[in-house]
């Protein structure tokens, strides 16, 4: 955010909105939102970010996508789609893939959430050794999570 606030970043893409303090010092976030040439938000609900965004794309809820999430205690769990997407809604990873394709920074591929998670586990040490198989039904702690998270 500081780089956007200083004007060295031209665009911000938010995958969720929320109160400004969610993204850092509110004054810096506000200045960043004012200084960027383009602000895009993917979300389900209105927020201070949506009020400033140049483009608001329809987001999806956890019930409309497959993937994983990591809770605040460092436990990674699977989420499974139980609702069908409607209209032009897309999962965040699809939006980012399409944006990357259009900007020429990502090759045209059709990844899936499991492959994306596999790449994350290869690239980020805290997720090393985790896979959809090791997550199972109860999830698993990332490296460095506390013992109470590891036990469940």
Predicted features along the sequence, with ranges:
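Long, compositionally biased stretches
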Residues: 45, 130-152
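Non-catalytic alpha/beta scaffold blocks inside enzyme catalytic domains
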Residues: 1-131
């Amino acid at each position: 955010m500081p780089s956007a606030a200083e004007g060295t970043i031209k665009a911000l893409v938010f995958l969720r909105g929320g109160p400004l303090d969610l993204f850092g010092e509110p004054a810096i976030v506000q200045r960043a939102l004012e200084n960027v040439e383009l602000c895009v938000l993917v979300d389900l609900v209105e927020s201070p970010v949506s009020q400033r965004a140049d483009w608001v794309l329809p987001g999806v809820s956890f019930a409309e996508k497959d993937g994983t999430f990591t809770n605040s205690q460092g436990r990674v769990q699977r989420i499974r789609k139980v609702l069908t997407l409607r209209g032009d809604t897309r999962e965040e990873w699809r939006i980012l893939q399409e944006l990357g394709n259009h900007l020429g920074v990502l090759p045209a591929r059709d990844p899936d959430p499991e492959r994306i998670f596999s790449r994350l586990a290869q690239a980020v040490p805290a997720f090393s050794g985790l896979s959809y198989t090791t997550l199972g039904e109860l999830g698993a702690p990332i490296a460095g999570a506390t013992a109470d998270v590891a036990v469940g």
